[in-house]
Amino acid sequence: MNLAAYYPVLLFLLVGTGLGIALVSIGKLLGPNKPDVDKNAPYECGFEAFEDARMKFDVRYYLVAILFIIFDLETAFLFPWGVALRDIGWPGFSAMMIFLLEFLLGFAYIWKKGGLDWE
């Protein structure tokens, strides 16, 4: 196996990492360091923090986040499928239609069970 083809990638990684470390270090060394009470206080939308940061969230926020991830992954699978559709032909098309039908049925189930209602 010829590893010489990977030397430009290794050089790119080393230069990028070295440059990043150098710039952060220069900023730490030359930048002003004057901490005070206001700079060290927790920031909450321009207001003083009025509650503990560890408060309970409604479980529906987590449900919406999980549903977003699921349907976002579905669209992530759609893009390469669309690019390769000419090469994969009818078997690939039918497999993706079955995949989309499963997600559509899942979406209908979530909707019917009230997973998207905020009442």
Swiss-Prot record:
- Protein name listed in UniProt: NADH-quinone oxidoreductase subunit A
Q: Which reaction does it catalyse?
A: a quinone + NADH + 5 H(+)(in) = a quinol + NAD(+) + 4 H(+)(out)
GO MF terms listed in the record are: NADH dehydrogenase (ubiquinone) activity; NADH:ubiquinone reductase (non-electrogenic) activity; quinone binding
Protein location: Cell inner membrane
Extract the InterPro entries matched here. Answer: NAD(P)H_OxRDtase_bac/plastid, NADH_UbQ/plastoQ_OxRdtase_su3, NDAH_ubi_oxred_su3_sf
Q: Which Gene3D superfamilies match?
A: NADH:ubiquinone/plastoquinone oxidoreductase, chain 3
Subunit-level organization: NDH-1 is composed of 14 different subunits. Subunits NuoA, H, J, K, L, M, N constitute the membrane sector of the complex.
Its membrane topology, per UniProt? Multi-pass membrane protein
Positions of transmembrane segments: 7-27, 63-83, 88-108
Organism, scientific name: Burkholderia vietnamiensis (strain G4 / LMG 22486)
Q: Which HAMAP family match?
A: NDH1_NuoA
